[in-house]
Amino acid sequence: MTLMVPFKQVDVFTEKPFMGNPVAVINFLEIDENEVSQEELQAIANWTNLSETTFLFKPSDKKYDYKLRIFTPRSELPFAGHPTIGSCKAFLEFTKNTTATSLVQECKIGAVPITINEGLISFKAPMADYESISSEMIADYEKAIGLKFIKPPALLHTGPEWIVALVEDAETCFNANPNFAMLAHQTKQNDHVGIILAGPKKEAAIKNSYEMRAFAPVINVYEDPVCGSGSVALARYLQEVYKFEKTTDITISEGGRLKRNGLMLASIKKEADNSTSYYIAGHATTVIDGKIKV
């Protein structure tokens, strides 16, 4: 196919351009999904060379507002956090929808409920499953990161498979310098996408504030500037560690080492049926608005 279709590049988890994590969003809402091949979508994502490129399609069912497909330069993902928020922002602009307060995104992992409140876009994590890891694996990851962890790390299934580890404080997290070759080897060997490193901001005015970093060298993302699925993983991990008994908000900063200033708002919500859900919210701003030849 050779078409000119609407295209946006959206900066996510920031209100100020160039300070968050960009996602390319391509509007295929007027194109049947079977008109474009997997190979064509992958080629576009490879060319944009962003951590993720997304494609908006018509949903398969009326219970959804749109279908989203998410690609890295190498492969398709079942779900990702910052592309979900950035693509929602783009969808609202593409469709000139200024009044929506809730949407449902269809993606490979299933339905993702989204709310919009005065520009703040929030999604309910479709999955956040916790799994313990062996002491040998913990030692290997400590060696790769070059730090001792203050709590046993764990594997979090949030779409991507993240190891989550806590260090003493935000400064320790910020100053970490992983051995990326060793980390890539460990994550490839264990079939993990990477590691989420976090440290509490002990002097912060806001309770439950954390500095976070996301390392995924095995997929050529040495450090993700601001990672939505990673923030889901961190929130779920903190719930497992600290056993919050009521709804708890977590403020997560990320990107400082990359000269970014991302801000994510996580909510560990206690539902009426006594289950626990995880929500991630953030702002997004469109930086590029035009067309792309596909």
UniProtKB/Swiss-Prot annotation:
GO terms for MF: isomerase activity
EC number: 5.1.-.-
PANTHER family: ANTISENSE-ENHANCING SEQUENCE 1, PHENAZINE BIOSYNTHESIS PROTEIN
The encoding gene: YHI9
Record's GO cellular component terms: chromatin; cytoplasm
GO terms, biological process: biosynthetic process; endoplasmic reticulum unfolded protein response
Keyword Chloroplast attached: no
Active-site residues, Swiss-Prot/TrEMBL: 52
Keywords on record: Isomerase
Name recorded for this polypeptide: Uncharacterized isomerase YHI9
Superkingdom per UniProt: Eukaryota
Enzyme class: isomerase
Phenotypic consequence of gene deletion: Leads to defects in unfolded protein response.
